[in-house]
């Protein structure tokens, strides 16, 4: 009884922080003609309510795709339509065709913020609570502390409740998928993850680990018996869920193709804006976006992404385990973020979710990563006038992690899950006994650099000849950190010889 009382308090704390952040500015507030993501979400409500389904993804006089045209899968459009019906009931002016463009008011802001909170309450927060309650071999106190830290992760709060998006929906469905598969409810887990992909196509970052883990399970059961039956059932679930989600758009071939063109805009190029991945960082030294033809950029990004995630995926197929599954989710999502085509700065949230899931296992490294992930979005958050909420929520999250997990005491090779790797290295370099000390120093350097760059960005004006200097530095420093984490998580995956035994049921 006490556990549920404390968990309720944790949820209320998470909701309070979310609503407090929502009182601040949002993307594109008072900035015509394009405004920002807030207007994009409102505009999608306008389009889905006033136009027939067949026109949602097509350019027309009533639906200018250059002005925040729909570029997410059908379930996102259905969600917008549902919100539009509620908006119509409250104030029809909010979704009036054409005349509502750029609509802003305190009442409308309250409505929009409430839709995010309701989605969070229905999908993401219950998944977090259940996940933490299902963790094995840790105390009730640690389960509650884990839930608190996950719910206080500033990156997701600042983007959904500050900038304005509905990332908690797709991430929540993905988490339900992780829960289902980790508890051997493979069909329900697969259904939940299909809903995640069909809500936001960026959930493809997590698709390979789901596929490899389930395939490994099928191999383990035997493809001539129970494994084959499971494989057929999984295939039926995937096909059925996609057909149901896309049914209105399967009536005509051109409808399906147009939606796909909107979901995967290859014409936009390798990257947009300032994002903390390899291509944007490397572009500072060599303008690969201008030098290489677009099809070469596409092939290059595919090759780098595929090669970087291959070892983890092979290991997961050969040795399927819940622990390996979660770490492979981190590794694959990070590979996609660093090397894939058309990455946005907010896509780092797709890496942050699985990192949150291993917070209780490697608290020091997880906390560090989640701090860097929030810092990597600094240029976007400053543009949205969210500096103060960013600082306060980041400090609150850091304090929660330090007090809950004593992270500075969890830096030994064993706590960092690097003991097997260190033993292997010491066979050739007996003097290699300082790995944990190196990581502590790297953490210190990383945090100091992030603090200094934040202060410089806020207090100093960039040189006239280099107006994007601080934004580029933020991306470059974040990218270096992410490369280090990619190596680290792959080391854990490859050198983990106990993934199939002595593991926790969920964690």
Curated annotation (Swiss-Prot):
Residues 25-114, 165-172, 248-297, 345-361, 409-437, 495-507 are lumenal. It catalyses: an alpha-D-Man-(1->2)-alpha-D-Man-(1->2)-alpha-D-Man-(1->3)-[alpha-D-Man-(1->2)-alpha-D-Man-(1->3)-[alpha-D-Man-(1->2)-alpha-D-Man-(1->6)]-alpha-D-Man-(1->6)]-beta-D-Man-(1->4)-beta-D-GlcNAc-(1->4)-alpha-D-GlcNAc-diphospho-di-trans,poly-cis-dolichol + a di-trans,poly-cis-dolichyl beta-D-glucosyl phosphate = an alpha-D-Glc-(1->3)-alpha-D-Man-(1->2)-alpha-D-Man-(1->2)-alpha-D-Man-(1->3)-[alpha-D-Man-(1->2)-alpha-D-Man-(1->3)-[alpha-D-Man-(1->2)-alpha-D-Man-(1->6)]-alpha-D-Man-(1->6)]-beta-D-Man-(1->4)-beta-D-GlcNAc-(1->4)-alpha-D-GlcNAc-diphospho-di-trans,poly-cis-dolichol + a di-trans,poly-cis-dolichyl phosphate + H(+). Keywords: Endoplasmic reticulum, Glycoprotein, Glycosyltransferase, Membrane, Transferase, Transmembrane, Transmembrane helix. Its main location: endoplasmic reticulum. GO terms for cellular component: endoplasmic reticulum membrane. Dolichyl pyrophosphate Man9GlcNAc2 alpha-1,3-glucosyltransferase that operates in the biosynthetic pathway of dolichol-linked oligosaccharides, the glycan precursors employed in protein asparagine (N)-glycosylation. The assembly of dolichol-linked oligosaccharides begins on the cytosolic side of the endoplasmic reticulum membrane and finishes in its lumen. The sequential addition of sugars to dolichol pyrophosphate produces dolichol-linked oligosaccharides containing fourteen sugars, including two GlcNAcs, nine mannoses and three glucoses. This is Dolichyl pyrophosphate Man9GlcNAc2 alpha-1,3-glucosyltransferase. It comes from Pongo abelii.
